[in-house]
Amino acid sequence: MKKLLLSIMTQMAMQMSMQVAMPLSASAQQLLPYQNANLSAEVRANDLLSRLTLEEKTKLMMDTSPAIGRLGIPQFQWWNEALHGVGRNGFVTVFPITMHMAASWDDTLLYKVFTAVSDEARAKAQEAKKSGNIKRYQSLSFWTPNINIFRDPRWGRGQETYGEDPYLTTRMGLAVVNGLQGQTFDGKPMSAPGVLAPASSQ
């Protein structure tokens, strides 16, 4: 359980460093260790875990994490999909389904597709942030790519994968993650250190 919470808090620390922080309560006006981007993610996550109550930790384990004002933690929505474009969020580009893109064997093209998806997702996330209430399908945390190897046609999510070839799935998965995260095709940051949109491979 501690490893699961540490993993979640590490992800939260990374997400929080990319968001505009909400105003801190009077008790949290000074810079706390978990807010210090110069510390490691593990140190920051452990510090944040030590400050959260059990009830707050429980609430943060859902796909909709409420704001925790006393610690300056903004509300966050963990659920967004981008298998072939930003999912269910108004007018965006819809690309072919994953299996069809895999049939191209063109990981450079897939990288370009997910760079475009990332651009659209960031624009949509900024729109949602202005409203002050980020809902499902409006965050920058994607449940993409699905890199499971598709070996059994009875599985209902096979069309979300890149097929049964491990080499192809590796190439396509890397292209998707690098495109979404704002990195170069070979995984190097384009500019400032960090990522623009984290991808959560399934």
PLM segments and residue spans:
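Positively charged n-region of N-terminal signal peptides that target proteins for export
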Residues: 1-4
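Bacterial N-terminal signal peptides
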Residues: 7-23
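Glycoside hydrolase catalytic-domain context in secreted enzymes
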Residues: 24-202
